[in-house]
């Protein structure tokens, strides 16, 4: 096995121009490398730049600064030897399974006989033998995603990039396809030498990956790297597996060092009037508080456990948990979600008392809500144009 890296990213930065001439920084200071025989996971919430980084690696976009190297050479444009499987099935509906798979070879001016041979081999490898003449509309979601895998593998890439390839599938179909992929990888039956998997499913990352890079947001950056040394096949119920999942939850909910004045960490994060608020409904907040307040959690829940119980992934759970923390209804600490005294009171209150508690916390801890309330109270009509507040908020964009 060659010890030199298949892929290297050195100080990669990506920014997009904004209408006012400033730039929106999406990725900053990205340093990573992928070596032969590795499955590397990029784990983080939506908006942390994982998919953007994947497109830079594939040559579908250019970095604003830094360099991506494949086999020691800079990536400039789509790189032959790197293939991608997308979250959506991305199939041409007017083409058959065979034609969709063969499409990747058509542009390589390959002899027709070789195209047919390799396409049929990829279709058979991924478990679609007998469906060569079927159209995408005739296939289930899992089968359509298998076509996506076959189309990527038919070009015999060295590196396979997977952008949340299982997230659009139901739980059982995703588990089957994930297991089949790992079996093919372990048996060495696929032509690929390395894999980069983008996911926001912590258990999926621990189940599949040898290394996990945990991403932070605004801008996207690598917070930590976690090596997974558990033998394959991995068991979700194994204590070592659960410990690693717990460790990642702790990493992703840890407060930044020096977050408070003078380097002191604040117990609760604060908001400004222009802070971007999580898009979370009060019914979801109420539901999570009720779940944590009830047995067996009784006010303090282990995040992996509550996520499993409620069938929520990190992109669903974290915004809700963080909103509860912003409103002082709960505290995130060490991978746990602990309700405050007011959070417990809310969970056990009737509907009218809940409204009073929620209003009190909303006005106390969300400056924008307090500002809107103050403006309305100052007016005899108790009304104001929406554009007034939008104009004010534009100063923070």
Predicted regions and their residues:
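Conserved ABC transporter NBD signature motif
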Residues: 66-77
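Helix-to-loop junction immediately C-terminal to a conserved catalytic motif
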Residues: 58
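The feature captures the beta-strand-to-loop junction immediately N-terminal to the Walker
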Residues: 43-45
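Hydrophobic anchor residue at the start of the ABC signature
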Residues: 85, 149
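Short coil-to-helix segment of the ABC ATPase nucleotide-binding domain corresponding to the Q-loop/switch region
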Residues: 95-102
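Conserved ABC ATPase "signature" region
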Residues: 102, 106, 113-131, 180-183
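Conserved signature/switch motifs of ABC ATPase nucleotide-binding domains
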Residues: 134-137, 155
């Amino acid at each position: 096995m060659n010890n030199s890296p298949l892929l290297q990213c050195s100080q990669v930065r990506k920014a997009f121009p904004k209408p006012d001439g400033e730039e929106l920084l999406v990725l900053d200071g990205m340093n990573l490398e992928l070596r032969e025989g590795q499955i590397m996971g990029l784990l983080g919430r939506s908006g942390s730049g994982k998919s953007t980084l994947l497109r830079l690696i594939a040559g579908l976009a250019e970095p604003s600064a830094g360099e991506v190297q494949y086999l020691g050479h800079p990536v400039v444009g789509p790189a032959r030897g790197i293939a991608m499987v997308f979250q959506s099935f991305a199939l041409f509906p007017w083409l058959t399974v065979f034609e969709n798979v063969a499409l990747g070879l058509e542009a390589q001016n390959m002899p027709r006989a070789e195209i047919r041979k390799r396409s049929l081999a990829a279709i058979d490898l991924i478990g679609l033998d007998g469906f060569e003449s079927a159209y995408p509309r005739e296939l289930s979601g899992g089968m359509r995603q298998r076509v996506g895998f076959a189309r990527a593998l038919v070009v015999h890439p060295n590196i396979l990039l997977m952008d949340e390839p299982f997230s659009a599938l139901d739980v059982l179909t995703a588990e089957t396809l994930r297991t089949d992929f790992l079996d093919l990888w372990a048996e060495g039956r696929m032509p690929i030498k390395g894999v980069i998997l983008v996911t926001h499913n912590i258990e999926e990352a621990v189940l599949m990956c040898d290394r996990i890079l945990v991403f932070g947001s605004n801008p996207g950056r690598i917070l930590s790297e976690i090596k997974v040394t558990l033998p394959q096949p991995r068991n979700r119920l194994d204590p070592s597996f659960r410990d690693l999942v717990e460790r990642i939850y702790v990493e992703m909910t840890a407060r930044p060092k020096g977050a408070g004045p003078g380097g002191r960490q604040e117990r609760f994060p604060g908001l400004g009037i222009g802070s971007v608020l999580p898009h979370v409904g009060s019914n979801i907040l109420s539901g999570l508080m009720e779940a944590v307040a009830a047995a067996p959690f009784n006010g303090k829940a282990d995040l992996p456990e509550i996520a499993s119980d409620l069938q929520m992934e990190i992109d669903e759970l974290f915004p809700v948990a963080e909103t509860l923390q912003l409103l002082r209804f709960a505290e995130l600490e060490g991978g746990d979600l602990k309700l405050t005294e007011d959070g417990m009171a809310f969970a056990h209150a009737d509907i009218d008392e809940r409204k009073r508690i929620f209003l009190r916390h909303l006005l106390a801890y969300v400056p924008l809500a307090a500002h809107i309330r103050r403006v309305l109270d100052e007016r005899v009509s108790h009304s104001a144009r929406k554009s007034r507040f939008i104009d004010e908020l534009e100063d923070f964009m």
